[in-house]
């Protein structure tokens, strides 16, 4: 990022808040290649992994020579965006990746400056980057809560909403026009946002740009929503000058001058929602609002959120997209886990002089279970098994080397084991390992035109080692499997703080 700042400081266009000229700079595409989600588009030869500066130079030259970016939607049907149909997709990919880097510039630098200013006050915690850090939070907080709102965040009904949201941060009109061009000219290529799936919404062709737009959209909503939650929880009188500067934030507030009046009005609006135990968690398009309050309070929050989205963000959300769950009776489906709070009885025998009696102490425990049916469905969709969970051979991999086939199956198995290690019941996970192990054996047997039994007999125990995680290997060397300590480590939940995404097979949302 320091190198990125050095380039930007030398560029006069950035000094005047003009982002559009940056799209003609070669180093922008270099950063897009280094940090983009789809790195293959700037590779001249994917086998050699070499960055093709020639493609970028040719693209910039074409943009200088002709007004390609001013073509209307009528011309896009003729596939003459850059003169050739097969180059159209490649050049669009490169520009969208570069434009994504450009739009991230003001927010990245703003974040760095804010962190540097507060470096002495804020404790740096890299562990909070892991999505597994959510579950220890659940274990600490959910035991004392009663209800949960499971929220599917609504998607923008019109792409212009995304542009309008961004224009309050990006003052360069040319860049915003270019963004509109990307969204409207290519919205038929696996559209930006689809209502069928809540957050499996991004075209894999433009992930960086679309992820940035959606995350920025959600961040804008959350910045206001978290402010409302703080007001309802603590009703503190603090300064909210940054929010007052935004035109679209509560239009009636433009006539308010004093922060006291601003805070007073929100106290009147939110007094029915007062709750000192309110917790908010989000991952992708799903969020959770947990409270210790009553069901009436949760219904108030539900319909307040619906009106809040519709009135102030032009987002249509139906009541059925927000579910109210009582933790003591219903499981919570979140991040490919079934989570619930269950009561365990602990009977203690007490002896007092000559009298003895039993004391039954109910203890709450946070329980997480692997969602086996959707996971088997994902394996079936990937052709590792049939819909009933019976392993089958992966025919498309039979052309690979034996070591590559075993490595691929083993990597998938280790990734799933790593992610689902926090499950309190691991029997379902053993079934997934069995499916992958036998599917691998059948794939190898099909390749060598042999039987599974004969192939397993020839490979021996070395074949199974690929399907063990590193933790299981270490534990098997240190502790015998029949010891009580080893059984506790194998069966107990184990959350990792280095997981930043859900494995593709685990992500069925």
Swiss-Prot record:
GO terms for molecular function: RNA binding. It comes from the Eukaryota. GO terms for biological process: mRNA processing; RNA splicing; tRNA processing. The keyword Membrane does not apply. It is found in: Plastid, Chloroplast. GO terms for cellular component: chloroplast. Belongs to the intron maturase 2 family. MatK subfamily. HAMAP family: MatK. This is Maturase K. It comes from Austrocylindropuntia vestita. The lineage of its organism: Eukaryota, Viridiplantae, Streptophyta, Embryophyta, Tracheophyta. The gene is matK.
């Amino acid at each position: 990022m320091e190198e990125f700042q050095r380039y930007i400081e030398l560029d006069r266009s950035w000094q005047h808040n003009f982002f559009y000229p940056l799209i003609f700079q070669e180093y922008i595409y270099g950063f897009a290649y280094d940090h983009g989600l789809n790195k293959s588009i700037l590779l001249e030869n994917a086998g050699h992994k070499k960055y093709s500066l020639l493609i970028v130079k040719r693209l910039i030259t074409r943009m200088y020579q002709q007004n390609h970016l001013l073509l209307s939607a009528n011309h896009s049907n003729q596939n003459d965006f850059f003169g050739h149909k097969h180059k159209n997709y490649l050049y669009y990919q490169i520009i969208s990746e570069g434009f994504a880097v450009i739009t991230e510039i003001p927010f990245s630098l703003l974040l760095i400056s804010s962190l540097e200013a507060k470096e002495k006050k804020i404790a740096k915690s890299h562990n909070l980057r892991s999505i597994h850090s959510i579950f220890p939070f659940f274990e600490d907080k959910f035991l004392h809560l009663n209800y949960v709102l499971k929220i599917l965040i609504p998607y923008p009904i019109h792409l212009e909403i995304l542009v309008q949201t961004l224009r309050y941060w990006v003052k360069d009109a040319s860049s915003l026009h270019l963004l509109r061009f990307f969204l409207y000219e290519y919205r038929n290529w696996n559209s930006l946002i689809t209502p069928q799936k809540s957050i499996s919404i991004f075209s894999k062709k433009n992930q960086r740009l679309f992820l940035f737009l959606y995350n920025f959209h959600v961040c804008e909503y959350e910045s206001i929503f978290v402010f409302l939650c703080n007001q309802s929880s603590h009703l503190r009188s603090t300064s909210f000058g940054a929010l007052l500067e935004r035109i679209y934030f509560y239009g009636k507030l433009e006539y308010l001058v004093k922060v006291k009046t601003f805070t007073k009005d929100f106290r009147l609006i939110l007094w029915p929602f007062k709750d000192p135990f309110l917790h908010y968690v989000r991952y992708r398009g799903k969020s959770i609002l947990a409270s210790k309050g009553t069901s009436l309070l949760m219904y108030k929050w539900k319909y307040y959120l619906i009106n809040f989205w519709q009135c102030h963000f032009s987002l249509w959300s139906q009541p059925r997209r927000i579910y109210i769950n009582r933790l003591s009776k219903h499981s919570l489906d979140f991040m490919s886990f079934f989570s619930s709070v269950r009561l365990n009885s602990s009977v203690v025998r007490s002896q007092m002089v000559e009298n003895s009696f039993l004391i039954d102490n109910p203890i709450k425990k946070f329980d997480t279970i692997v969602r086996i049916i959707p996971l088997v469905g994902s394996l079936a969709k990937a052709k590792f098994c049939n819909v009933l969970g019976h392993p089958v051979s992966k025919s498309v991999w039979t052309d690979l080397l034996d070591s590559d086939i075993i490595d691929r199956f083993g990597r998938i198995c280790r990734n799933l084991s790593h992610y689902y290690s926090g499950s309190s019941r691991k029997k379902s996970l053993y079934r997934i390992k069995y499916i992958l192990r036998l599917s691998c054996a059948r794939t190898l047997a099909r390749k060598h035109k042999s039987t599974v039994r004969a192939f397993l007999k020839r490979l021996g125990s070395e074949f199974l080692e690929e399907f063990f995680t590193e933790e299981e290997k270490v534990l098997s060397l240190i502790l015998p499997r029949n010891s009580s300590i080893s059984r506790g480590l194998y069966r107990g939940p184990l959350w990792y703080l280095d997981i930043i995404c859900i494995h593709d097979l685990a992500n069925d949302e």
